[in-house]
């Protein structure tokens, strides 16, 4: 799929399909309003019959409408004028793209000026438009042997403001974010035999090629052992695939400026180890590396956007499988920062590899650390797949997270983290246990475990994307109904912006 922003009068274009928009009726206007005045007049019968109501995401397709240079016309609802937001535009663009695809055309135009009429923040709507279209275009079918969806669709976003500097910059930002999210989605969707720790590391290296000021370093098993990462090594013992530790460094500010640090869990497949998972749904455990994939995407986006910030992305990657060398319940390992932990359940392994990554992040003395992980089933019970739960005790970072999430349109929910949760993670024979001695609160106690590997005074937030890392398309139309979502990449970029 190709997208571009054209500085043109929409009526001068020739194209198989045109997308215009409708807005719901109001006290002033008894009928819904189509945002293109001539098409509004031509569709008055449909408006009077309520075929077009302007309801958000309503899609009405007029085949063979033959308006000027357009063969088909698609009318997509924006909802009520005063309820149009950046997120609602993303979702309307998802409806627009699906309608374009259903028409089986190779080219379409979007009447962007119909969205921005009377709106001061045209640039923000341009960003949302690009994001919505590109995110919806994602399809993972490369492993199919039969007919694949390969038809190229060119979508022109047409506006008389197409040469406006702010509008162009925002559209390009949305296009970068959308493409990077799709890059990370693909990493998550690849099955475990085609997405090993080595392949994940190679993907980070490949994705960073040609991007200025972005460096990728990959530690192999020997280096990981030398660096005393006992958590990552311990989990990897049960697999023939060697672990990898991925370090992505972006230099966008003065060398004296401390970095912001993003940490991701990269479990490319997790059977649970000796504490083996039930068979039902185990195939979805290829998604246990989505936190890592999304941190890779975050660093790619920050670098492509040339943000004036120093940023580091760290991904600890391994498989959690079973062989004669696998970690056993009761085994004790030592993390990079010297703390010891009992592995009382080998299926609580993500926190063990994150322990080493967070310890390393602390050594960088960053301005803040944020981590992302498909960490606990308890988070799915608590919040389902609508919100990403996050934990932080730092009020300033909490404010930044909430602001960033509001800007990105991703839903987050602040979860409790207290000293009582820390107490529940104390070990009997080691400093810590990797599972709680208390009842319930599995997500909070997991966060409490991670907190023990973050340096005192460093602002830190933990995002548990177990419920939002994949299969969220029932709520978000620009996400696949099945498959990786790319959760939190856009929010993390917005967090990074606040440190520029």
Swiss-Prot record:
Mn(2+) 1 binds at residues 270, 347, 349. Its main location: cytoplasm. It catalyses: Release of an N-terminal amino acid, Xaa-|-Yaa-, in which Xaa is preferably Leu, but may be other amino acids including Pro although not Arg or Lys, and Yaa may be Pro. Amino acid amides and methyl esters are also readily hydrolyzed, but rates on arylamides are exceedingly low; Release of an N-terminal amino acid, preferentially leucine, but not glutamic or aspartic acids. The active site is at residues 277, 351. It is found in: Cytoplasm. Binds 2 manganese ions per subunit. Keywords: Aminopeptidase, Cytoplasm, Hydrolase, Manganese, Metal-binding, Protease. GO terms for molecular function: manganese ion binding; metalloaminopeptidase activity. InterPro entries: Leucine_aapep/pepB, Macro_dom-like, Peptidase_M17_C, Peptidase_M17_leu_NH2_pept, Peptidase_M17_N. Mn(2+) 2 binds at residues 265, 270, 288, 349. It is an enzyme of class 3 (hydrolase). Its cofactor is Mn(2+). One of its GO terms (biological process) is proteolysis. It comes from the Bacteria. Gene3D superfamilies: Leucine Aminopeptidase, subunit E, domain 1, Zn peptidases. Its EC number is 3.4.11.1, 3.4.11.10. One of its GO terms (cellular component) is cytoplasm. Belongs to the peptidase M17 family. Presumably involved in the processing and regular turnover of intracellular proteins. Catalyzes the removal of unsubstituted N-terminal amino acids from various peptides. PANTHER family: CYTOSOL AMINOPEPTIDASE, LEUCINE AMINOPEPTIDASE-RELATED. This is Probable cytosol aminopeptidase.
């Amino acid at each position: 799929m190709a997208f571009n922003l054209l500085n043109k009068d929409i009526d001068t274009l020739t194209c198989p399909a045109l997308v215009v928009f409708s807005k719901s009726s109001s006290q002033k206007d008894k009928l819904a309003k189509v945002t293109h005045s001539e098409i509004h007049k031509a569709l008055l019968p449909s408006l009077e019959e309520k075929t077009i109501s302007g309801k958000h995401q309503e899609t009405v397709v007029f085949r063979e409408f033959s308006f000027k240079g357009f063969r088909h016309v698609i009318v997509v609802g924006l909802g009520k004028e005063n309820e149009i937001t950046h997120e609602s535009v993303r979702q309307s663009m998802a409806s627009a793209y699906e309608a374009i695809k259903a028409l089986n055309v190779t080219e379409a135009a979007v009447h962007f000026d119909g969205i921005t009429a009377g709106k001061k923040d045209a640039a923000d709507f341009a960003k949302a438009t690009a994001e919505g279209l590109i995110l919806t275009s994602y399809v993972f079918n490369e492993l199919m042997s039969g007919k694949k969806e390969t038809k190229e669709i060119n979508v022109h976003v047409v506006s008389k403001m197409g040469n406006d500097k702010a509008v162009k910059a925002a559209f390009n930002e949305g296009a970068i974010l959308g493409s990077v999210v799709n890059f990370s989605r693909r990493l998550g969707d690849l099955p475990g035999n085609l997405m090993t720790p080595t392949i994940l590391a190679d993907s980070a290296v490949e994705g960073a090629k040609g991007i200025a000021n972005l460096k990728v370093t990959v530690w192999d098993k020997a280096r990981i052992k030398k660096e005393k990462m006992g958590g990552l090594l311990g989990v990897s013992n049960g697999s023939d695939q060697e672990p990898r530790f991925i370090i992505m460094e972006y230099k966008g500010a003065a060398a004296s400026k401390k970095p912001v640090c993003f940490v991701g869990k990269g479990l490319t497949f997790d059977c649970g180890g000796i504490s083996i998972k039930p068979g039902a749904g185990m195939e979805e455990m290829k998604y246990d590396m989505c936190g890592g994939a999304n941190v890779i995407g975050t660093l790619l986006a920050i670098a492509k956007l040339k943000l004036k910030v120093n940023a580091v992305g760290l991904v600890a990657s391994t498989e959690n499988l079973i062989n004669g060398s696998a970690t056993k319940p009761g085994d004790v390992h030592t993390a990079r920062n010297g703390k010891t932990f009992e592995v009382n359940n080998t299926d609580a392994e993500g926190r063990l590899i994150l322990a080493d990554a967070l310890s390393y992040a602390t050594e960088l003395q960053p301005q803040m650390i944020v981590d992302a992980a498909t960490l606990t089933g308890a988070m799915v019970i608590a919040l389902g797949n609508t919100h990403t739960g996050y934990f932080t005790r730092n009020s300033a970072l909490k404010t930044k997270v909430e602001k960033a999430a509001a800007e990105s349109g991703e839903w987050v929910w602040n979860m409790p983290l207290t000293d009582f949760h820390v107490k529940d993670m104390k070990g009997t024979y080691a400093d810590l246990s990797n599972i709680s001695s208390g009842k319930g609160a599995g997500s909070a106690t997991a966060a409490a475990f991670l907190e023990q590997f973050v340096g005192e005074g460093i602002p830190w937030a933990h995002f548990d994307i177990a419920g939002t890392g994949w299969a969220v398309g029932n709520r978000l139309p620009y996400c696949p109904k099945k498959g990786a979502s790319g959760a939190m990449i856009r929010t993390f970029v917005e967090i990074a912006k606040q440190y520029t």
